[in-house]
């Protein structure tokens, strides 16, 4: 038995032992999960070695559940190595309304910025995917639930305008609870601003692919997330404007349909174009981008029709 085989067998035995019912097994399970060596799937309760889960793009190998990932992880998974060029890194949110709930909005921002090492809930920039240049934006749900404030909307609008000017395809990954209430109307106006920028991108006949990740709600759903020329979603994603509980309490007509607001339900109703597992997403995006690239003949010189001589038909 090679050394690698020995480690694989040891890992397998450890995984089996962690399912035991003795107090010692339970204590070790808690300790090793706390140490970050193992992660428990919230869907099937399977324990997976953290490194194995990372190699599988944070997708449970047992049931296919897609764990939530960060914006930097998403970019690392998708883009060609060394191709990422961030844009508008200097933009940071302020507190124009001096909003206060349980604590000042400015303090809440500082807490999330320290916790996530992000200035706001989206990363935008340029890169390449399988050698194809793209403009890409990825929302990060860790930052205030991925809520869209003035900076998030501004960065997405600027990215879209850059893609329009540079004739680049645009890819946006959504993960949001909606507009950021702490910024009031300044957050709501981002819906119109991002939608207008995307219309100009469409008028320039450039491709926009929207990718829905869990969860996507509120003003993000009501604006750029559902405006893609192609709308993709990861399996099991929850997508909607208001949550199911809010809808049930508002309309007062009992339970909503089973699986309401899931990606699978939306696909069956024709609201999205495809459900793509995360492990296949890079390949599928590359295929779609390649299909929509300008054809070679479009760059050839045009033919002067007057210089042609028509031959008589026999």
From Swiss-Prot:
Pathway: Lipid metabolism; malonyl-CoA biosynthesis; malonyl-CoA from acetyl-CoA: step 1/1. GO terms for cellular component: acetyl-CoA carboxylase complex. Keywords: ATP-binding, Cytoplasm, Fatty acid biosynthesis, Fatty acid metabolism, Lipid biosynthesis, Lipid metabolism, Metal-binding, Nucleotide-binding, Transferase, Zinc, Zinc-finger. Residues 37-307 form the CoA carboxyltransferase N-terminal domain. GO terms for molecular function: acetyl-CoA carboxylase activity; ATP binding; carboxyl- or carbamoyltransferase activity; zinc ion binding. Its cofactor is Zn(2+). It is found in: Cytoplasm. It is an enzyme of class 2 (transferase). This is Acetyl-coenzyme A carboxylase carboxyl transferase subunit beta. It comes from Synechococcus sp. (strain JA-2-3B'a(2-13)) (Cyanobacteria bacterium Yellowstone B-Prime). The lineage of its organism: Bacteria, Bacillati, Cyanobacteriota, Cyanophyceae, Synechococcales. The gene is accD.
